[in-house]
Every structure is written in C-alpha cells, then in structure tokens.
C-alpha cells in the first residue's frame, strides 16, 4: 500500500508541475484552437466596429467575396468582441485580429504572433495612432490581410496532407512526371493519359478533382491568359469527356478567368482561377490552376483543382484543393513545409505565461 501511495503521489506531482513547464516560452500543453476554417474573431470596441470608419474598413476587407466562385461566398465568417471580453476562452480562437489604436504609435503597422494561446493559431495586431490612419491603412493593405489568413489556413491543410495523403496518386505522379504532390485521400479514382493524370472522388455532389499535366516550354507567350486557356481547353477536351459523345470539359467565359503571377518556393508560378463547364451538358463549377516551369526538363507542369458541387458552398472545398497545389514538388526540389506568410510584417514570438 505504501508503494502504491508513493507512485500515486509522484503522478499527482507530475500532473501539477508539467502544465507549468515551459519550452521556448510556451506551455507543453498548448490547447487546440477553437473555431472552424475561415472563421475570424475581431477584437475591437463594439461602437467602433459597428459605427465608425475603422470598423467599417476592416469589415469591408474581411467581408469580400472569394474570387473565382460561381456564387458569392464570403472570405471569412466574422465574429466581433470588445477588448474587455477577450478572455481565456476567446483567446484560443484560430484566427484573430486585434485592433490596437493608441496615440503612442507614430504610424500604422501590421504584426503577428503564431500559436500564442492555442495551436494552430494566428493573431494579427493592427497598430495605428488614430482611427483615421487605421482605416486608411487597412483599406490599403486589405489584400495583404486576406492573403495572410487565407494562406495560414492553407498551411494547416498542408500539415494535414503531410500526415495523411493519397500515396497511390503520389506514386503515380512520381512515375509519370518525376514529381511529387500531396492530395486528399478520398480522391481514389484516377485516369491516366499522355502526360496527364486526373484523380477524383467521383461523387454525385461535392466532387473533388485534381489534374496534373505537362507540355514543352517553347512559347514566349506561355504565361498569358489567352495561351493558358487555349492549352487548358485542348488538354481537357481530350482527357475529360462528358457522359455522351461530343461532351467535354472547357473553360467557361474567359472574361471571368482571373490570372496572377505568384511565388511558389521562391520561384515564378502562373495562377489562374475561373469557371469550367461541360460542353453539351449542364455541369460546371470553379477551378484553380498553378503552372510552373521545370527548367531542367524544358517543360511546363500544370496542377489544377476543380469542384462539381451543385447547390453547395464551394469555398472550403476549393481552398482544400488549392492547398494541395502548393505541395507540387518538381524534380530536384524538396517538399514544401508551408506557404510563406507574413512577408514584410513583424513576427512577435509568443510568451504566454498567463494562459
């Protein structure tokens, strides 16, 4: 009995001591963050949030529509609380923006902290000396704010994909293209063509699809909107037919295709997002593509995610696939750990001694 009591007392002491232990300024028992993907908590005075320019400016940024979707869907689901209510319960939210407006500051500034009170978590603080400069700064940096939290959410998806992804498709992509990519495990069905692979969940609704294809890099106009759409349509017409003869995938109205030059692994990439449709059928949905240059092999490698989800919200489905596009690893590259976020911002290391 004495030995049992001794071991019990040791266990009790460990339970009392360990939660207070620190490693790199953080508790060993960091709680899991609360909230769903693409939910945002804004910490700002209620009157300022609802009635004044500073609040209206921030709401206007966060309440914008996601580009490239057939129906309007907001970038984030937003909640607001006052600073006095930002307690232990609210601090573990996954995405937080804190408005810090004080005359001690000389100019507006963005800074962020990761995993301060929970994990995974991103807290952005927007500092400004007054409300007018806050509003002006937020409006000017609206896309920076959106990209920061969008890519942070995608990084969480990449972490999940690293732990669990479709190994069969990764192996197929390796043998066909000499590349690696992580896609969700439920894309089990696949089709192989010439320099082409298509993986799909093959569901009637909320159908997720991934495509990879390549072609020689020979044209100076390769990374233009017109060239990309022409190449995409020619590849999809051959490889993604419809239910009946004469049906095939094509890009919907090119006027609604948005393109951008982006950075992936510190290398140039061409991004396109828009809508696809099935010629001769009533099917369609959104797509997003990345085209990258594989210089040693003189080719362009394109990865694309597209969704067929009639009467369903598509934001989270598309962003899940978009995160997978960032995991494309060309020959002689190493697999990505995360998308770069917060470039040009100050990252503050968390020291949460009072969780």
Predicted segments — roles?
Residues 26-44, 49, 104-166:
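Solvent-exposed alpha-helical segments and adjacent loops
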Residues 74, 78-133, 237-298, 312, ...:
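Signature of long, low-cysteine stretches enriched in small and polar/charged residues
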Residues 17-20:
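C-terminal motif of bacterial Sec signal peptides marking the signal peptidase cleavage site
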Residues 1-8:
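Bacterial N-terminal signal peptides that target proteins for export
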Residues 25-28, 34, 41-47, 184-248:
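Secretory pathway targeting signatures of secreted, lumenal, and periplasmic proteins
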Residues 135-156, 187, 300-355:
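Surface-exposed amphipathic alpha-helical segments
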Residues 30-35, 43, 47-50, 60, ...:
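N-terminal "mature-domain start" segment
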């Amino acid at each position: 009995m004495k030995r049992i009591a001794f071991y019990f007392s040791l266990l009790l002491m460990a339970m009392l001591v360990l939660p207070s232990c620190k490693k790199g300024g953080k508790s060993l028992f960091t709680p899991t963050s609360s909230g769903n993907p693409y939910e945002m908590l804004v910490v700002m005075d209620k009157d300022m949030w609802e009635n004044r320019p500073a609040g209206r400016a921030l709401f206007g940024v966060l309440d914008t529509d996601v580009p490239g979707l057939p129906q309007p869907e907001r970038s984030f689901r937003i909640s607001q609380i006052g600073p006095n209510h930002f307690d232990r319960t609210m601090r573990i939210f996954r995405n937080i923006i804190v408005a810090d407006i004080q005359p001690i500051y000389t100019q507006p500034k963005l800074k962020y902290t990761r995993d301060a009170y929970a994990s995974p978590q991103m807290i952005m603080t927007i500092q400004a000396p007054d409300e007018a400069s806050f509003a002006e700064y937020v409006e000017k940096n609206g896309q920076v704010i959106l990209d920061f939290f969008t890519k942070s959410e995608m990084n969480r998806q990449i972490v999940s994909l690293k732990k669990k992804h479709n190994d069969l498709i990764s192996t197929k992509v390796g043998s066909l293209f000499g590349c690696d990519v992580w896609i969700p495990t439920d894309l089990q069905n696949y089709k192989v063509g010439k320099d082409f692979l298509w993986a799909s969940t093959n569901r009637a609704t909320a159908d997720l699809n991934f495509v990879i294809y390549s072609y020689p890099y020979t044209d100076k106009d390769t990374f233009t909107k017109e060239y990309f759409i022409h190449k995409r349509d020619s590849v999809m017409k051959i490889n993604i037919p419809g239910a009946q003869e004469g049906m095939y995938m094509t890009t919907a109205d090119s006027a609604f295709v948005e393109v951008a030059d982006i950075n992936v692994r510190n290398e140039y990439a061409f991004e396109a997002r828009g809508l696809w449709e099935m010629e001769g059928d009533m099917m369609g949905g959104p797509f997003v593509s990345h085209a990258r240059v594989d210089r040693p092999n003189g080719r362009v490698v394109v990865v694309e995610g597209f969704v067929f989800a009639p009467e369903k919200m598509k934001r989270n489905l598309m962003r899940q696939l978009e995160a997978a596009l960032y995991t494309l690893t060309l020959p002689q590259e190493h697999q990505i750990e995360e998308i770069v976020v917060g470039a040009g911002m100050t990252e503050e290391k968390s020291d949460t001694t009072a969780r």
